[in-house]
Each structure stands twice: as structure tokens, then as C-alpha cells.
Curated annotation (Swiss-Prot):
Organism lineage string: Archaea, Methanobacteriati, Methanobacteriota, Methanomada group, Methanococci
InterPro entries tied to this protein: Ribosomal_eL21 (IPR001147), Ribosomal_eL21_arc (IPR022856), Ribosomal_eL21_CS (IPR018259), Ribosomal_eL21_sf (IPR036948), Translation_prot_SH3-like_sf (IPR008991)
Family: Belongs to the eukaryotic ribosomal protein eL21 family.
UniProt name for this protein: Large ribosomal subunit protein eL21
GO molecular function, one term: structural constituent of ribosome
Species this chain originates from: Methanococcus aeolicus (strain ATCC BAA-1280 / DSM 17508 / OCM 812 / Nankai-3)
Key words, A-Z: Ribonucleoprotein, Ribosomal protein
This protein's GO CC annotations: ribonucleoprotein complex; ribosome
Amino acid sequence: MQKSEGFRSGTRYKLKKHPRAKGLYPITRALKQFENGQTVHVILDPSVQKGMPHPKFHGKTGKIIGQRGSSFIVEVKDGHATKEIIARPQHLRECKN
């Protein structure tokens, strides 16, 4: 059988919520604002498909460099390259440093 090559392929465990975390996110997470230069973690929320970056960026840490509508532009290192991803605040967590 031919292997699927969709956007979410190979994410059976990566995009799975724990049983106690199932359901929709808190509304405050969607209204969260970040400052330019702030460090954030990219943690994908599988219950929100809009504004979700590619699953290979799940768990990466980056810097906010701008805003585009209700989404944020995050600069993330991918190997030796620096990439800009666009993500909604539901998929971003503030870094505690």
C-alpha cells in the first residue's frame, strides 16, 4: 500500500492529547499576546487546526519576530538554517527563562 504523505502524516503519538487534557483549550490561550524578542516554545495543540505549524517544529524553541493578524511569526533553528514559522497563540507557550 502506498504511504500517505499528508501534512499530519506520521504524527500518531505526537498530536495526541493525554486523557485529562482532552477537549477544547481555555479561551485565554487564544487571546495570549507576545512581545517581539520574547522566547517561546512551539507546542502544537491538536484540537486547533488553524494556524498550526508543521509537526516537525513541535517542541522547538524560538523567538517572536513579528505579528501577522492574530498569528505570530516565530524564528526557529532547523539544523543550521533559521526558519520563520507562522503560528497562532494556541500553539505557543511562553518560555519560563
